[in-house]
Amino acid sequence: MKIRVINPNTTASMTDKIGEAACRIAAPGTLIVASNPRSGPVSIESHFDEAISAVGVIEEVRAGELEQTDAYILACFGDPGLLAARELTRAPVIGIAEAAFHLATLISTRFSIVTT
């Protein structure tokens, strides 16, 4: 199985750390491909940054489709471009924020988000 883990910002050092973390927990035989867009914000701090980064996510999913990627993970709390990415592929596209929210609702009926 090939999983493309997409860092929606352009910070390569962060992408490397994300890829390393994913590789540590991946099942044997799973290929993790960590990627980030060629252009876009170095950090996603505003609605504008989120909108620009969504374009990069779309480009990364298109590239993944050419490589026959089996699943995608958006490694950014805001899940930028999540719904658009799902329209481009039949493969699962999981946003880490959405996944965390779903898990939180299994633990409790109420939860909070603490951010800076």
Model-assigned labels for residue ranges:
Residues 86-108:
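Short, acidic/small-residue loops that bind anionic groups at enzyme active sites
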Residues 64-72:
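Short acidic/histidine-rich motifs immediately flanking catalytic phosphotransfer sites
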Residues 33-35, 73-74, 93-96:
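General beta-strand structural signal in soluble alpha/beta enzymes
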Residues 70, 78-88:
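Acidic/His-rich segments in extracytoplasmic proteins that coordinate ligands and/or metal ions
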Residues 1-58, 116:
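N-terminal glycine-rich anion-binding loop in soluble enzyme alpha/beta folds
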Residues 10, 37, 77, 98-99:
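Short, ordered loop/turn segments at secondary-structure junctions
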Residues 13, 102-116:
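Short, glycine-/small-residue-rich phosphate/pyrophosphate-handling segment
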